[in-house]
């Protein structure tokens, strides 16, 4: 049973502790949500209310104490007066006279509550309005014995106490009755306290609490009045000003206030309306300017990127998107370094940081930096990047950086090919010139010691080298002529004659290399629209190219046949619905797929990759240019180590 009660007590204490904790947490949360201004106001109000309540309490308490002191003095005087009058009567032991005097004195003084007279032995001699037995029950004799034991009666000094044993507060005064240092008795008189003192303590508390509550009520009412009449419109105005400052010009205040506050609200709404119209005009103007800028940037051949001072992308054109493979990505507002290739970031990011640092730490000046970036990892590309700072010219503050990206990959490759071409041509020209000079000098210096067969052999070699030199020079001249704007007259041409002439020209060369050179021409092949000499040059270059890359015992076939024209242009004269296709095929070393895309570039030689054959690298470029002059394209099908097949189509000349 005892254990069960202890368990109940512990459960109750635990529940009470949980409840108190929850209340405290709610109070802490509520207090944390209160603003600092409200906290300060509450603390100030609390301090003022406590101060005013304390002052009120102190003032009323002082008045109460002063009143009590006056009552005590009155009681002392009254008791001394009574003691002086009853001492002779008590000395004469005249009980009846004592009774009459005390009764008369009691009845004539309304403030007296009771009168007790003790004899020298401490026994009640007379009492009013209580009987002796009742008085003994209400009052103890300790005070009287104190007088007797400590001889206080010699001083005739009254003892004043407050007696609460009766209903109401009574000032209890004890005075020794003595004459000539002889104790005759003791007078105990009870005087009713001032009625105001009875209620003054409660009044003091009530007034202090009322002052405290009144101050809080005044503050609360003042705050409520202030909130509804002043604070609310001011708060609305403050919110409106903040929204206006943040760019929300649609903010309006709709409060029914008159006077100066109403005029202020009206002027605020009018200002917001004007700002809204001004913003709309600016937005339209900015939109128009932005559209113009975007149109201008999009038409620039180079890549263009505009960054803000935090390196976030503001504007990027199509060329830059294609250069960096950003198709389908929305990079506007993103940091540029998150989207650039790693190679570019490593070279570009330090420079961008340096530009921003210098413009923040030093006086901002407009500057342009140029860097060349080469990509080597996934694909080889070369970019020329121009970085130009964009400044606010009024305050010389950095606003952003403009990046111009030029793809110089093709130029670099052409430059490399050109350098290779110069190296090849210089080598190819130097070799025949050296051979020609060597053999001519030998003939000149040793012609007497050489027989006719040796002289003829030297002259034949010199003649061969001269032809080789002539071909090199002609290749360069032909390419320059073909790349110019010179117009060539296209007329009906006998393609069969051109093919047969080419075969006759290179039949001996093919025989020397043990290569079979065949032709396969469709019977009754129609004439084509072209330039006979240029067609001869096409066939010669392609046949020479095949001879160069075909192993001994190989085969070269030159075909010509009619094919349907899938892109017939019936409105153009000299055209019909068919074309003649020319093919030059071999079973030589073939061309890799990678090189097939580059084989028609100027100065590029397939021997750059095999390092066994000679040439300038202009033959196929010349072929491509000639075929383009004939409004056609050259195509290539090749497999490495299996051979190659070049083919192109020529338009059939219309019969007049």
Swiss-Prot record:
Which GO CC terms are listed, alphabetically? chloroplast membrane
Look up the domain of life of the source: Eukaryota
What is the uppermost EC class here?
transferase
Record-level GO BP terms: osmosensory signaling via phosphorelay pathway; regulation of DNA-templated transcription
Report the residue ranges that make up the HAMP domain in this protein: 231-280
Question: Which Pfam families does the protein's record reference?
Answer: HAMP (PF00672), HATPase_c (PF02518), HisKA (PF00512), PAS (PF00989)
SMART domains noted in UniProt: HAMP, HATPase_c, HisKA, PAS
Kindly list the places in or outside the cell where this protein is found, as annotated in its UniProt entry.
Plastid, Chloroplast membrane
Q: Name one GO molecular function term.
A: phosphorelay sensor kinase activity
The principal localisation class reads plastid
EC number assigned by the record: 2.7.13.3
Q: Which residues carry this modification: Phosphohistidine?
A: 427
Show where the Histidine kinase domain sits: 424-654
Domain PAS, by residue range, is: 289-359
Which residue spans adopt a coiled-coil conformation according to this UniProt entry?
none
Catalytically driven reaction(s): ATP + protein L-histidine = ADP + protein N-phospho-L-histidine
Protein name stated in the entry: Uncharacterized sensor-like histidine kinase ycf26
Provide the taxonomic classification.
Eukaryota, Rhodophyta, Bangiophyceae, Bangiales, Bangiaceae
